[in-house]
From Swiss-Prot:
Part of the ABC transporter complex ZnuABC involved in zinc import. Responsible for energy coupling to the transport system. It is a peripheral membrane protein. Residues 6-227 form the ABC transporter domain. Belongs to the ABC transporter superfamily. Zinc importer (TC 3.A.1.15.5) family. Keywords: ATP-binding, Cell inner membrane, Cell membrane, Ion transport, Membrane, Nucleotide-binding, Translocase, Transport, Zinc, Zinc transport. GO terms for biological process: response to zinc ion. This is Zinc import ATP-binding protein ZnuC. PANTHER family: METAL TRANSPORT SYSTEM ATP-BINDING PROTEIN TM_0124-RELATED, ZINC IMPORT ATP-BINDING PROTEIN ZNUC. GO terms for molecular function: ABC-type zinc transporter activity; ATP binding; ATP hydrolysis activity. It is found in: Cell inner membrane.
Amino acid sequence: MMPILVTLNKISVTFGSRRVLNDISLSLRPGKILTLLGPNGAGKSTLVRVVLGLIPPSSGSLVREPGLRIGYVPQKLHLDATLPLTVSRFMRLKPGVKKADILPALTRVQAAHLLDQPMQKLSGGENQRVLLARALLNRPQLLVLDEPTQGVDVNGQLALYDLIEQLRKELGCAVLMVSHDLHLVMAKTDEVLCLNQHICCSGAPEVISTHPEFIAMFGNRGAEQLAVYRHNHNHRHDLHGKIILKNSGSRGA
């Protein structure tokens, strides 16, 4: 039986009087990709921080494999434009990094040519590859990617999806990927979890390889890598985030 690296059981998180996450349960397994989808303010970043152990849940339980190695790619990296920082120096800022490990990590993500480039001059796609290389330095069992394609053009997104799939196969690691885009997700995702404070729905994504508009935009390669996840919600959320059942019109907390 495949081991479970991280298990969340009925996790809730409350900040003051505001409940950010409610009754979240999920499991992360080696070699599997779980994509979190949801609008801004849905609690995705909070859930990531719970998984990373940065904040404790207000209720529920979190169990992690002892000694679990995690690689994390943050949503945004803010660097002082006046700070002289090459990719090589940036990589060495990670504690315990050996200089000999830097070039192989960059090579793995096809970014070796960026070794001596200033971080501030990198494109969105190049920046994400460098962050990904840095996350790989500790040979992670779990790779957490927070909005990995934000600020990356369509071609760069396709390339990153290819790379994530390749790393999943090579490392056999679990991947937790976060997105706010409710329409486009990785076709190779094993499970999609739609979040809006609670789990709205979850399941395998649908590959839309025969959709003419999608093929016209991305081509057949894009159809293999991207998919539209069809939401089968039995409810919607009002402007205050409350649940409104579609059939009855009643609300839940």
